[in-house]
């Protein structure tokens, strides 16, 4: 795993991609830091700088993660990885930790900015809150990296991986607004749950290579949804609202930096990270045995 980790870090900075992405995020942070924190004397680094750079992450992470596995498939070097004695989990973690190190570089500079505010008179409580916000920001980034790595494992085209990653993060970014639109009634929840059931059934059928299993999965999901709609429609609405809330990747960070320190928010980002790393391992395991 360590050899893969070193190889991935080296590849990020062998060309310009690592330097360009790091500079991109640093410039964005520096602009808000100088204009708001220093210009107006605002000690809240989490809200005025980190939160304002969230939109930049929609471009940063897809470009950072697009080549992690897509390039390996395109150059056929993934066959060497999959036939090596290294466990699939070790391959995934090696690449994941390498990308996390790349993302940590601008975060280290952000930490220096927080210390600068402290040196200029920010209180100890404000400084601790800023470091807590930076920790949450980093865990958010780790979750986004895990999502991007998973999407990269599904294709051999880096552009497709980047576009899919940007679309997924944009959807998560807009999800709070979409949640307000789609939780207006049980009929809307039923329709969207049915669409989700169709997607899951297609995935189940493709992974098992069984059309019958896909059809049975869809029929079972539709039957369960119909029963819920007729007998407990409120459960359907509440359940769909909970699903949409879980897809709001950036909303918990917004609440966190608004002086709402929350351990569940940190646990949420760790859970998303582990979940998508697990999905990536399963995808590579399937290809290894095929």
Which residue stretches match the model-derived regions?
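Alpha-helical transmembrane segments of polytopic membrane proteins
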Residues: 51-54, 133-140, 186-196, 214-218, ...
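Residues that define the loop-to-transmembrane-helix transition and helix capping
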Residues: 19, 89, 158-159, 264
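Residue-level recognition of pore/gate-forming positions within transmembrane alpha-helices
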Residues: 25-29, 98-99, 166-170, 222, ...
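Helix-loop interface residues and adjacent transmembrane-helix termini in multi-pass membrane transporters
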Residues: 13, 85, 154-155, 260
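Helix-loop-helix units of permease transmembrane domains in multi-pass membrane transporters
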Residues: 68-98
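Transmembrane helix segments
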Residues: 158-256
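Hydrophobic alpha-helical transmembrane segments
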Residues: 1-71, 112, 204-208, 213, ...
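Secretory targeting signals
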Residues: 29-36, 40-56, 98-165, 173-181
């Amino acid at each position: 795993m360590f050899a893969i980790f070193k190889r991935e870090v080296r590849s990020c900075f062998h060309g310009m991609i690592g330097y360009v992405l790091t500079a991109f995020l640093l410039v964005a942070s520096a602009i808000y830091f100088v204009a708001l924190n220093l210009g107006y004397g605002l000690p809240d680094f989490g809200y005025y700088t980190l939160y304002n750079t969230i939109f930049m992450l929609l471009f940063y992470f897809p470009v950072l993660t697009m080549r992690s596995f897509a390039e390996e498939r395109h150059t056929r070097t993934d066959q060497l990885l999959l036939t090596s004695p290294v466990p699939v989990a070790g391959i995934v973690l090696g690449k994941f930790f390498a990308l996390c190190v790349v993302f940590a570089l601008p975060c280290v500079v952000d930490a220096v900015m927080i210390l600068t505010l402290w040196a200029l008179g920010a209180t100890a409580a404000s400084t601790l809150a800023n470091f807590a916000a930076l920790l949450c920001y980093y865990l958010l980034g780790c979750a986004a990296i895990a999502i991007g790595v998973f999407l990269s494992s599904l294709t051999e085209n880096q552009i497709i991986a980047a576009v899919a990653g940007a679309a997924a993060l944009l959807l998560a970014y807009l999800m709070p607004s979409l949640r307000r639109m789609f939780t207006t009634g049980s009929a809307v929840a039923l329709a969207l749950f049915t669409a989700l059931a169709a997607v899951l059934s297609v995935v189940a059928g493709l992974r098992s290579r069984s059309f019958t299993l896909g059809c049975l999965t869809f029929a079972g999901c539709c039957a369960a949804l119909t029963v819920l709609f007729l007998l407990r429609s409120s459960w359907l609405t509440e359940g769909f609202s909970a699903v949409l809330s879980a897809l709001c990747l950036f909303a918990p960070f917004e609440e966190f930096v608004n002086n709402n320190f929350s351990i569940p928010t940190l646990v949420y980002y760790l859970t998303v990270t582990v979940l998508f790393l697990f999905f990536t391992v399963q995808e590579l395991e399937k290809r290894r045995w095929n």
